[in-house]
Each structure stands twice: as C-alpha cells, then as structure tokens.
Amino acid sequence: MNYFPWLTIIVFLPISAGSLLFFLPHKGNKLIKWYTICICILELLLTTYAFCYHFRLDDPLIQLAEDYKWINFFDFYWRLGIDGLSIGPILLTGFITTLATLAAWPVTRDSRLFHFLMLAMYSGQIGSFSSRDLLLFFIMWEFELIPVYLLLSMWGGKKRLYSATKFILYTAGGSVFLLIGVLGLGLYGSNEPTLNFETLANQSYPVALEIIFYIGFLIAFAVKSPIIPLHTWLPDTHGEAHYSTCMLLAGILLKMGAYGLVRINMELLPHAHSIFSPWLIIVGTMQIIYAASTSLGQRNLKKRIAYSSVSHMGFIIIGIGSITDTGLNGAILQIISHGFIGAALFFLAGTSYDRMRLVYLDEMGGMAVSIPKIFTMFSILSMASLALPGMSGFVAELIVFFGIITSQKYFLMPKILITFVMAIGMILTPIYSLSMSRQMFYGYKLFNAPSSYFFDSGPRELFVSISIFLPVIGIGIYPDFVLSLSGEKVETILYNYFYR
C-alpha cells in the first residue's frame, strides 16, 4: 500500500494554488495566465508521475487508496482511489484543462476570477473521478457546478445568462435525484450509513427498490451526459459560452455523466441495469439519429457541433447497455476519443469566430484562402468526428458495433435492426460534418467583417490544435493504449452480471 497522499494533493493543488491568483497584481494579465498554465502543467505532470509509478494495469482493485475519517457524527470518510475506469478520464481532464487554459489566452476581463474558476472546476472534476465514497462523489459533483455556472454566466455571448440559468436548473434538478439515490443506497438495510463503493458493490437490494434507485441515478446522469430528452440545455450553453469553457464542457463535463452511469448504475445496481439495458440501447440509437439529423438543420456553428456531441454520446450509451466487455470497452474508448475531438472542434470554431465575428454558417464562406492553417486543422478533426479510419472515433464506434453484435442478451433480429439504425446515424454524421466545412471554408461569400481580422492561426493556436490531434491519431492507430487501462476493471464489473 502506498501511504503518500497522491490523490489528495492532486485534488487540492489546482484550487489551493488558484486561490493565490487573487494576490497577484491587478493588471498583470500575462502573469495570471502564465501562472495558471504552470499550475495546470504541474498538476498534469504530478498526475502522470503518480499513475506511471504507482498504478498497475493487471490489478482491477482500487489503487492509490486513501481513507481518512472526516466527520465522526455521520461516519463520513475522505475516500479516494483510482482503478482502470477512472484513470483515463482523470488524465483526459488534466490534458484538456491545460489546453483550455492556453486557449483562454485572449480573455482579459476579470482574468483572475476566470482562471481561478477554471482551476476550481479542475479540482471538482478530479475529485468526482477519484471518489470512493458515495457522499464525497455527490459533494464533488455539486461543487463542480458552481464554477461552471459562473464561467457560463459571466463570459460568452449575449444570451449567456439565459443559457447559464437553463444549465443550472437542469443540473440542479438532476442533483435532487442524485441526492435521493445516494441517501437511499447509504441508509438501506443498516443502522449506520454505508457509503463506501466497495461495500455497496457487494450489497443486494429488493428488485423494486433497486429499480427506484436506478431511475434516480439515471435521471441525474442523463442530464449531464446528456441523454435525450434531457439534452436541451447543451446546445444553448455551447452556443453562448466562451470557447475555452466549451472545451471543458464537451471534453470533460459530459463524460462525467457517462462515468457515473458505469460507476454507479452499472457497478452498484447490476440487476436493475440488466432490466434497463435494452431501453438504454433503444434511447442511444434514437439519440444518434435524432441529434445527427437535428445538427444538419442548425445555422449556428457551435450549436451544430453541440448536437454532434449529443449524437456521439449515443454510442457511449449503447456500449454501456450492451453488457459485454467489448461494448463497455468501446464506450470507455469513445469517452476518451470524443473528449479530444469535441474539445478540438469547439476550439477551432472559437478561433474562427475571433477572426470573423460570425456565428451563422449561412453568413460564412471562402475562409480556406484567408486562414489555411485553421482550415486544415478543422478539416482533419472533422474527419476524426465522422469516424475516419485511422482516427480514434472510428475504432471506438467499431468496437461498440462489435459489442452490440456479440451481446448474448439480445436476439438476432433486434441486433440487426439496432446495427442498421446505428449505421444510418453514421451516414448522417459525414453529411452534417462535411456540410459544415463546406459552408465555412468553400465558396465566394463576401464578408461583412473587416479584413483586418483575417490573420491565420498563430503558434499558440497551432500548438493547441496539434496537441489535441496527436492523441486522436495515436489512439486511432494504437487503441490498446487506452483499452489496456480499463480491460481488467471492465471484466470485474461484468463478472457481477453472470456470477453475482
């Protein structure tokens, strides 16, 4: 056992170091930005070091475990730990947050508060992914909403307050169900509350009660993922938020919902999950088709990308519902893959907006000549989004396909029907994706914006784009890098479905 509190340091470093931002000179914008980037890089290096030297791939149990008594009255513990399921999202969080901080370089208004909120959000997300106590998971889940709401309401478009209010209403509503589920699981069948994930994973419940718990958690995670019809906050939020915030939302926030589905609904409530899994697959299939076809009708560039995110989350839901190791591994790979691709597309959409100050696709056109570097990167990452072979999206979606086909739970005809509908969704993806590129970069449209805005991508923007592109191509060529992290844990989770 490792006694050094690696995870506690990793959770507290961003927010505690970020609080020092308020003691920096008021007009030292450049100093504030460099300080924040250095904190993010230090955090990422510390996380990578701890995982490289103390995480063993062949061990499905909790590693780097920390267990401290916190509040005696509630028998509440500060429990942290990682396994194959959480290591990928934690590393993704560090990587995307570091690049989002670099992407936020143009932000000058209330710079100290902006960067502090990004670091506070970073701490909340790492805390959620590494929690081993149900109440601690809930606290981190809620804590992370505060900086997100402030980032949405204070920086962004003209309707940012409306979109931030919509976001907080949806997520707060979902949190009520999450709290009910947490208290129900913790207080069931014992005199003392039991909130430890390991203890709860071995506990059984009456079927009706387990279904009630499952529905409560499902609603909470469906808002965050998002799963239709609880997705309507997402396009508005992405349409109005600053693009660095969009990177964090698309890259990490949506993945927290999918992570919760696997960590709690699937791992702690396996009987209810096996009952609901056919419905998850049906909803996921509908989501792929609905969001892809809705995306095609969006005039707003960022809303079109937002609907593409909803469509891609459908594959994750199908992978989780397949109850096979192939399908679940595909879902985890899609979580990581779409984290990179979604963040990259929002970043490039934001840098394009910085130059031309246009958000509607029908007002754009002919940008390829003016900004060839952005055009090249946007085209490549659009190809990654439509699952071009050799990119991470292709491997993830293919593995989810295999997962649903090889599932023993479903009959042949439903599997053929679901696969056929998923294939239609994959055909719709290139239609809206290539249409978006055509409207932005091709044609001879005359702009109403001054020509002085049309300078191409600088070194900072190129660095961010290439840094996100490299993992996308790397995972596409060698997906086993991600799959090897989660393989043992996935087998352990699925063991419950057949031998519990």
Curated annotation (Swiss-Prot):
Xref: InterPro entries: NADH_Q_OxRdtase_chain4 (IPR022997), NADH_Q_OxRdtase_chainM/4 (IPR010227), NADH_UbQ_OxRdtase (IPR003918), ND/Mrp_TM (IPR001750)
Entry GO terms, CC: chloroplast thylakoid membrane
Subcellular localization(s) per the UniProt record: Plastid, Chloroplast thylakoid membrane
Main location, first listed in the record: plastid
GO BP field: aerobic respiration; ATP synthesis coupled electron transport; electron transport coupled proton transport
Catalytic reactions of this protein: a plastoquinone + NADH + (n+1) H(+)(in) = a plastoquinol + NAD(+) + n H(+)(out); a plastoquinone + NADPH + (n+1) H(+)(in) = a plastoquinol + NADP(+) + n H(+)(out)
Keyword NADP: yes
Membrane-spanning residues: 4-24, 31-51, 87-107, 113-130, 134-154, 167-187, 208-228, 242-262, 272-292, 305-325, 330-350, 386-406, 416-436, 462-482
EC numbers, comma separated: 7.1.1.-
Topology in membrane: Multi-pass membrane protein
GO MF annotations in UniProt: NADH dehydrogenase (ubiquinone) activity; ubiquinone binding
Entry keywords, A to Z: Chloroplast, Membrane, NAD, NADP, Plastid, Plastoquinone, Quinone, Thylakoid, Translocase, Transmembrane, Transmembrane helix
Residues spanning the signal sequence: none
Homology family: Belongs to the complex I subunit 4 family.
Name assigned to this protein: NAD(P)H-quinone oxidoreductase chain 4, chloroplastic
